[in-house]
Amino acid sequence: MTAGRPGPVRSDLQVVLPAWITARLLVAAAWLVVRLAGPGGGGVPRPVERGLLAWDGDWYQSLLVHGYDGVSVEGVRFFPGFVLVGRLVDAILPGGPGVALVSLANVSALVAAVLLHRLVLLETGNRAVARRAVWALSLFPPAFVLVWAYGEGLFLALAIGVLLCARREQWWTVALLALAAGLVRPTGALLAVPVLAAAWRPGVGSVRLPARIAAVVAGPVGVGIFVWWASVHFNEAFIPMNVQRSLRGDPVNPVRRLVDGVGELFGGEALGDGLHIVAVAGLLVLLVVLFRNWPARYGAFAAACLLVGLAADNLNSLERYALNGVPFVLAVATLASRRRLGPAVMAFSAVGMPFLAAMAWWGSYVP
């Protein structure tokens, strides 16, 4: 086995498990800090009372137990993939729906990290960079949701699987994984961007054309299947998007939204949308690093995810949407490989991730 090729899964786990465990210890520390801080004022319980089922986790649990007809119409904005797999886990794992969803989220995050390790090894042949990428994913500030009962872990496992299989030109496997990703998160539609770039490189011609076409369209098709079903079931066209729009506002020009956000840094929203703009600034730096150091398809996917996140009046959860654009962590790994920046980058992540988790459990940050 050469130094740059992945070996058995056991060797991947030796790299991944320390980062995976560390992330969960940091999230546990954040939970403990918020719990020790006491209950919320005015008798209103804080999200910390819900533990790993806080925020969207409650929605996913309700959907698993009651289905879309058993929750308010707002629930239709959550795509069904995570819930459907959660039901399978619940059928075989004791402990109830909450345990099933949390277990699925955490195991999926572990799988995502293993696949990322293999992807970076395949792209770079550099085990040090692959290890840093795993740590970057595990400690990426919004990655605390990979510990909670959120669908991000499952989506990332599928999305990284898409990128890995596209790199290997396993187009039918890409199509299957992308279709599943589209049923987990609407961001699955954006997987068409990196897959298209990988499938239609110069000189490829028409070899295996049906498989490559299927790979490109599978993500949007997965999203479309649920949107079609929900539209028919609730007798309202595009109802998942309409519900999401009612919460995040109408689509806006991303550039204009960014300019407006800069002004919010100095107004009453300095601790609200203003902080999201600071995050955007950091993500733009990562985007430049990504385009300069990695194949363009990764930068294109990350850029598409960021643009979609910015194309809304309400920027809540923007950082989590950026996490779906998983190549951002490749840029973090690149920066962490530089001697002067490495310690600062990892220290920022090690502080930022539990800080955001604590803010979310406190109720002052929407994950």
Model regions and ranges:
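Short hydrophobic/aromatic helix or loop-helix immediately within or flanking a transmembrane segment
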Residues: 51-95, 254-258
